[in-house]
């Protein structure tokens, strides 16, 4: 597997990438704006993509803006698989008995927190109180990488 080949010391994930990162076992996890509820919302709404024109409309509405990471293509087949993906991630949570290190950063101005896609309450339910709120948005601004994320990486990896 790629884990055996690369032997990562740490995994970092942001937004939906945090859900992917949580599924990786045996390494510390640093997560930024983890969208823990997104797989379940997308999975429940997948039927909308069967309506002609909806996939195209959502692709236009949610096209990556400057600074966004990558496109999410809203097809039925893609969206319906998200529920299993979310369940697999949460099965690897602290609440489910995993003793990996998990830490999350949440921006106070994260527009996805208003929708429930990103939820501190969901984080606390599955991972406890190992998180930090910071004055930022959904995508971590550079200054927060330097003053919050990097120091935690150094601490987790015991780099002096």
Give the residues covered by each predicted segment.
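Gly/Ala-rich beta-loop-alpha elbow adjacent to hydrolase catalytic centers
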Residues: 11-22
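The alpha/beta-hydrolase serine catalytic core
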Residues: 28-159
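Solvent-exposed polar/charged
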Residues: 4, 22-23, 125
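Detector for methionine-enriched segments
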Residues: 3, 16, 132-133
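Active-site catalytic motif of lipid deacylating hydrolases and related acyltransferases
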Residues: 1-5, 138
């Amino acid at each position: 597997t790629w884990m055996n080949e690369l032997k990562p010391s740490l995994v970092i994930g942001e937004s939906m990438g945090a859900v992917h990162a949580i599924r990786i076992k045996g390494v510390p996890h640093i997560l930024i704006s983890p969208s823990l509820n997104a797989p379940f919302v997308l999975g429940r709404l997948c039927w909308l993509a069967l309506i002609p024109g909806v996939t195209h409309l959502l692709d236009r509405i949610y096209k990556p803006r400057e600074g966004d990471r990558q496109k999410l293509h809203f097809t039925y087949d893609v969206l319906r698989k998200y529920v299993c993906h979310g369940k697999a991630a949460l099965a690897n949570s602290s609440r489910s008995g995993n003793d990996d290190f998990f830490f999350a950063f949440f921006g106070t101005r994260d527009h996805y927190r208003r929708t429930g896609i990103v939820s501190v309450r969901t984080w606390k339910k599955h991972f406890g109180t190992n998180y930090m709120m910071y004055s930022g948005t959904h995508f971590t601004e550079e200054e927060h990488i330097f003053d919050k994320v990097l120091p935690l990486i150094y601490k987790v990896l015991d780099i002096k």
